[in-house]
Swiss-Prot record:
Transmembrane regions: 48-68, 90-110, 117-137, 154-174, 195-215, 223-243, 254-274
Species annotation: Shouchella clausii (strain KSM-K16)
Molecular function via GO: undecaprenyl-diphosphatase activity
GO biological process, one term: regulation of cell shape
Main EC class the enzyme belongs to: hydrolase
One family name in Pfam for this protein: BacA
PANTHER family named in the record: UNDECAPRENYL-DIPHOSPHATASE
Location within or outside the cell: Cell membrane
EC numbers on record: 3.6.1.27
Name of the protein in its database record: Undecaprenyl-diphosphatase 2
Coiled-coil ranges per UniProt: none
HAMAP family per record: Undec_diphosphatase (MF_01006)
């Protein structure tokens, strides 16, 4: 493996870590950084490049699982809930499952059709459409004078509604974080609470989707490229650790509009570059 391959793997892992959980669409950034600049498919072959992107996504997932390990242990029943979370209050595995259900079902039913509509223009329009949803979410949340709810206040009904918003992420470029955080704040959650629920829901659905993709493409896994895969995985893991912590600290202060404006600019850039 030459130096350039190490650099490409590290940069793509960096991009994955920066964008997978921020509401800005990792897909749109990968198009610009990889398809226009680094061209990993030319470097290692299209199938290996596809497998690599699955691997770096797993690095990001592992980072979030580590950050939320206490909550995950609680949901799995290995750690007791706080006393204040008794009598039906508190986030439960059932609520997470309800939130996962809509996107999981639609994803299984329409996976091939969603892949068939993947095109730079559809990604660009998804970025812009998602941006307007995020702006609307901040507007609605600001006008809601009721006390904003925390993640342990989420009801089954709210979990299902957020899960329905997550279905928008099946449109390539819309962003899972963008759609679900927007849904959460529209329903009266704080931005951080919506982000927490989003990241917790993302772990099982992304593990499932990545594992399924990896199994389907197992024959394409090139053992000689393990250092390439490992470099990207580690890069994505470490960057995701930092980005998610930073994002959760800031999101209640900066809200969604700054990300929305960035998405509009990125969407317009993609339309210009690929017009």
């Amino acid at each position: 493996m030459d130096v350039w391959e190490w650099v490409v793997a590290a940069i793509l892992g960096l991009v994955e870590g920066l964008t997978e959980y921020a509401p800005v669409s990792s897909t749109g950034h990968m198009i610009i950084v990889d398809d226009l600049w680094l061209k990993s498919s030319e470097l290692v072959g299209s199938q290996n490049a596809y497998v690599f992107k699955i691997v770096i996504q797993l690095g990001s997932i592992l980072a979030v699982a580590l950050l939320f390990k206490d909550r995950l242990l609680q949901l799995a029943g290995f750690k007791k809930q706080a006393a204040t979370q008794s009598e039906g209050r508190g986030l439960t595995l059932g609520k997470v499952a309800v939130g996962l259900l809509p996107a999981a079902v639609l994803g299984l039913l329409f996976e091939d059709k969603m892949e068939s509509i993947f095109h730079v223009r559809t990604v660009a329009f998804a970025l812009i459409a998602g941006a307007f949803l995020m702006i609307a979410a901040d507007f609605i949340n600001k006008r809601n004078n009721k006390k904003k709810q925390q993640v342990d206040d989420i009801s089954y009904k709210q979990a299902l509604a957020i899960g329905l918003f997550q279905c928008l992420a099946l449109w390539p470029g819309f962003s899972r974080s963008g759609s679900t955080i927007s849904g959460g704040v529209m329903l009266g959650l704080t931005h951080r609470a919506a982000a927490n629920f989003t990241f917790i829901m993302a772990i099982p659905i992304m593990v499932g989707a990545s594992a399924l993709s990896l199994i389907k493409n197992w024959d394409a896994l090139d053992i000689s490229l393990l250092p390439f895969y490992a470099t990207g995985f580690i890069s994505a893991f470490l960057v995701s650790l930092v980005v998610v912590r930073f994002f959760l600290k800031l999101i209640n202060k900066i809200k969604l509009v700054p990300f929305a404006l960035y998405r509009i600019a990125l969407g317009l850039l993609l339309l210009f570059l690929f017009s």
